């Protein structure tokens, strides 16, 4: 089936958009390479994207990263296809904030974020490189019947906790990431623990 949407109004912008970050992003946002989450400045390209192979039990990729329905977990016919939530680096909206700005600025960025989401879908449908050659997955489609929205996009923007929480103390990767803790403690992996917090109810 071909569910290719019309090119989004801002597709030309997002197709060429390179995040202005330090350390630098590895290239265009609409690509499968992205900055390594634990090693800033390094590129990570290992996930890839192949809904068909990932459905059949191939290695994990972007499709299965936030998959909520895998047809193999249900009786045949229960679902026509897998269903995934797209919460990837490629649809992280970077040009502005919506939580500490005037209403007009907020509306501008909400519109921009929707355009980015639609542009990512259109790019995946038409231009995303396929491992076996060729480009695009035209069978991809939004699911308004699942999201409960007219267009199939999310009901609300997802704002990461670090942007919206006003904490007494912020736990960071340096407190829990094995490599950082090994360096901090001077220990081997098997002897390394997360940083202890006396007032913690649980870290996980």
Regions found by a protein language model. Name each.
Residues 1-204:
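Flavin (FAD/FMN)-binding glycine-rich loop and adjacent Rossmann-like elements that form
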């Amino acid at each position: 089936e071909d569910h290719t949407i019309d090119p989004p109004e801002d597709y030309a912008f997002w197709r060429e958009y390179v995040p202005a970050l330090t350390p630098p992003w590895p290239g265009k946002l609409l690509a499968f390479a992205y900055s390594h989450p634990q090693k800033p400045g390094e590129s990570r390209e290992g996930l890839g994207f192949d809904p068909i192979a990932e459905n059949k039990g191939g290695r994990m990729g972007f499709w299965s990263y936030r998959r909520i329905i895998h047809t193999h977990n249900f009786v045949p016919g229960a679902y026509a296809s897998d269903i995934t939530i797209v919460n990837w680096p490629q649809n992280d909206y970077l040009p502005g904030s919506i939580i500490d700005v005037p209403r007009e600025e907020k509306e501008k960025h909400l519109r921009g974020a929707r355009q980015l989401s639609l542009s990512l879908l259109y790019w995946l449908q038409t231009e995303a490189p396929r491992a076996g050659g060729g480009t695009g997955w035209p069978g991809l489609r939004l699911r308004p019947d699942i999201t409960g929205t007219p267009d199939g996009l999310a009901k609300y923007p997802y704002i990461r906790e670090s942007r919206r929480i006003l904490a007494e103390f912020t736990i960071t990767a340096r407190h829990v990431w094995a490599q950082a803790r090994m360096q901090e403690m001077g220990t081997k992996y098997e002897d390394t623990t997360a940083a202890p917090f006396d007032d913690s109810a649980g870290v996980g």
